[in-house]
Amino acid sequence: MVTGLEAAGVVLALLPLLVNQLENYATGFEKLKLLHRYRRVFSAYALGIGTQQTIFLNNLEKVLEGVVEDEDKIGALINEPQGNLWKDVSLQDRLKAKLGRSHDVFMGNMIALHDLLVTLSDRLGLKISTGFSVCFRYGAASAENSN
């Protein structure tokens, strides 16, 4: 039979274990909150990069209007912002005629922005696929894992 003294001893022995488990639970809960916050911030960065990419592509499309008539060629130029098609002398002459003194600044900014979007996408683990579209890898992975 358990006496009062032995029961108190068991309770006192279990109390530190219980407190330790509660501390572990609280630590785990804090890590979950940090992960949730990280995912929210990461999603905001992915959205920001996607937005800048859309602005970038819209600017390319706008500047090519009236300069290039072939829709397929426009698509190829937009899909490869630093591709060989951009080096075509005839295209550059038409772009210079359209943009005037802004041509060199525009081309410099286009190259710098493209490089920056690629670098940021790589650092954040975003995938750049055909058409220079930025995809949020985590969203694709979580959708696959939910099945």
Spans of model-derived segments:
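N-terminal amphipathic alpha-helical segments
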Residues: 1-136
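Solvent-exposed flexible segments
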Residues: 134-144
